[in-house]
From Swiss-Prot:
Residues 431-439 are cytoplasmic. The gene is DDOST. This is Dolichyl-diphosphooligosaccharide--protein glycosyltransferase 48 kDa subunit. Keywords: Endoplasmic reticulum, Membrane, Signal, Transmembrane, Transmembrane helix. The keyword Chloroplast does not apply. It comes from Sus scrofa.
Length: 439
């Protein structure tokens, strides 16, 4: 009986091993919320690009009563895609507060809206420093619309010059013009974390396309955001697109040409390339940095001392890596600075790349106390990189001071001259004999 039970246990273990291997090999868990499941077919190219990169997609309607992002204090997914602009209430235990908590926990969120936008997406945008225009409004441009739009001029042809100058976010390859049809956004001017990824042209504005303009539009000119992004202080990333059609197969495969006479016709839009680049950035496949080993020591030594001494000549080195194609590779940057800080920086210098690490040699200031080697690297499109190493710097010991200090030579001269003068005066005073007066 015992041998039979052991055999069954081993058989069960061998059956479970492939399943465990599949679980271990699974990619980032991504929840996709849709207005309806037909969007899986109309936006199949975008979802296929995610699957080809190893993402595990879970499709659900936005009002599904079984929806859940957090269970027992743990996040069930790594990423969230919201392709349900018209949702009025999320299902299950998902709401704007839950999504905000997900972002605060470091989760990545991709949101696509449209002219039929509901209150939940509007509230989520407000939480992230983005304000959507009213429902049923659209971005209108009477000078930069596609030739196929002969009515309301809401099918916008966005030039690549209006893209954010950040290859890490929008990609490094040149793009064809972008097709856009959707709602406009404006950024909170008091929120420095918002990124204007794609803006409208100077002739664009956001209003009701079927009504005459009776008041100043919500967004005008370059202030009209078509695609916006956010990188929070905890490196969580969010992207808002005012157009759900931007990610559709129809827009990916469509030809594009401005309606202005003499404009060039392109056989395909740049939507697919831009959408892939944005998804790579927001889901942290691009622009992710990390700190590797950090070392510091006196020049000529290999290990750090218990305490440094003022005016020591030291060497500091740090390894910085970048995530590329799923692997950590050395980061290539020429603007990384090191600060040697007590309260304020006493030394600020550039780090030079040597092999797979960045290093620099410098001399400590003639000030003692508790200092920090600090690298604080914050660049557009990259995660915030921070490294701090605390060290003690003591004054010189009595035996370490110079015998004679050059700057004190005048005082030495005055002291010795006083001694010589006193000696001469004493000799003269003691040996001088007054002449006797004669009668």
């Amino acid at each position: 009986m015992e041998l039979g039970a052991a055999a069954r246990a081993w058989s069960l273990l061998w059956l479970l091993l492939p399943l465990l291997g599949l679980v271990g090999a699974s990619g980032p868990r991504t929840l996709v919320l849709l207005d309806n499941l037909n969007l899986r077919e109309t936006h199949s190219l975008f979802f296929r690009s995610l699957k080809d990169r190893g993402f595990v997609l879970t499709f659900k309607t936005a009002d599904d009563p079984s929806l859940s992002l957090i269970k027992y204090g743990e996040f069930l997914y790594d990423n969230l895609i919201v392709f349900s602009p018209s949702v009025e209430d999320f299902g299950g235990n998902i709401n704007v507060e839950t999504i905000s908590t997900f972002i605060d926990g470091g989760g990545s969120v991709l949101v696509a809206a449209s002219s039929d936008i509901g209150d939940p997406l509007r509230e989520l945008g407000s939480e992230c420093g983005i304000e959507f225009d009213e429902e049923k409004t659209a971005v209108i441009d009477h000078h930069n619309y596609d030739v196929s739009d002969l009515a309301q001029h809401t099918l916008i042809v966005a030039d690549t010059e209006n893209l954010l100058k950040a290859p890490t976010i929008v990609g490094k390859s040149s793009l064809n013009p972008i097709l856009f049809r959707g709602v406009g956004m404006v950024a909170d001017p008091d929120n420095p974390l918002v990124l204007d990824i794609l803006t409208g042209s100077s002739t664009s504005y956001s209003f009701f396309p079927d009504k005459p303009i009776t008041q100043y539009p919500h967004a005008v000119g370059k202030n009209t955001l078509l695609i916006a992004g956010l990188q929070a202080r905890n490196n969580a990333r969010v992207i808002f697109s005012g157009s759900l059609d931007f990610f559709s197969d129809a827009f990916f495969n469509s030809a594009v040409q401005k309606a202005t006479p003499g404009s060039q016709r392109y056989p395909q839009t740049g939507n697919y390339e831009l959408a892939v680049a944005l998804s790579r950035w927001v889901f942290k496949e691009e622009g992710v940095l990390r700190v590797g080993p950090v070392s510091h020591h006196r020049v000529g030594e290999k290990a750090p001392p218990n305490a440094y001494t003022v005016t020591d000549l030291v060497e500091y080195s740090i390894v910085i890596e970048q995530l590329s194609e799923g692997r950590w590779v050395p980061f290539d940057g020429d603007d990384i600075q090191l600060e040697f800080v007590r309260i304020d920086p006493f030394v600020r210098t550039f780090l030079k790349r040597k092999g797979g690490k960045y290093s620099v040699q410098f001399k400590f200031p003639d000030v003692y106390g508790v200092f920090q080697f600090k690298v604080d690297y914050n660049r557009l499109g990259y995660t915030h990189l921070y490294s701090s190493t605390q060290v003690s710097v003591r004054p010189l010991q009595h035996t370490q001071y110079e015998r004679f200090i050059p700057s004190a030579y005048p005082y030495y001269a005055s002291a010795f001259s006083m001694m010589v003068g006193l000696f001469i005066f004493s000799v003269v005073f003691l040996h001088m004999k007054e002449k006797e007066k004669s009668d």
